[in-house]
Amino acid sequence: MTDEPTTVYNFQVEDFHTYHVCTLGVLVHNAGKNYASLEPDKYTELTQSEVKDILKERGLDEQAAQNLIDSFDGPIYKREGFKGEAFTITESNAGEASGVFVTRESAGITHTERINNLALPPNNTAMAESTVQLTRSQILLEGKVAAQPDWAVIADDGIPRSGGGWQVVTDGGKYNGAIER
């Protein structure tokens, strides 16, 4: 973590809040003096092979694992998530999304910002945001969202799907009992 001022993009605050940025670029809201527990040593950068091993253990085939890896722009980090830890899920309607992909906070003020920052597929309108909690401790995969220009072409809605948000991959979302609403 750093206590030095850091430039942050795509970020809006309406009131006074305390934020800290770690060397991995993770923005931590209202961490206060306890932010030392969120230091980068809690994150382990993984190789593609290590990510594939984790995803194979979760039941993904080679192509599904590669597609998930390709949804990241840059390094993929592993971190232990704890039961009760809360995340935001972005979906068309409350209850529709799987919860495999979540975020720490909202990925944008408008649905257009959320679609762009998370490079969402054409079937996710991002009109709803809900809070979900982890049902158990689990390994989370985290990193920066990659651009999805092919989805922008398919959607034909003028949203470029540039990515750049921070995504968290749970251990299967609602399909594996990893999250609850």
Segments the model singles out, each with a brief description of its role:
Residues 34-181:
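Catalytic toxin/effector domains delivered as secreted proteins or via bacterial secretion systems
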Residues 1-36, 133, 144:
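HINT/intein-family self-processing domains that catalyze protein splicing or autoproteolytic maturation
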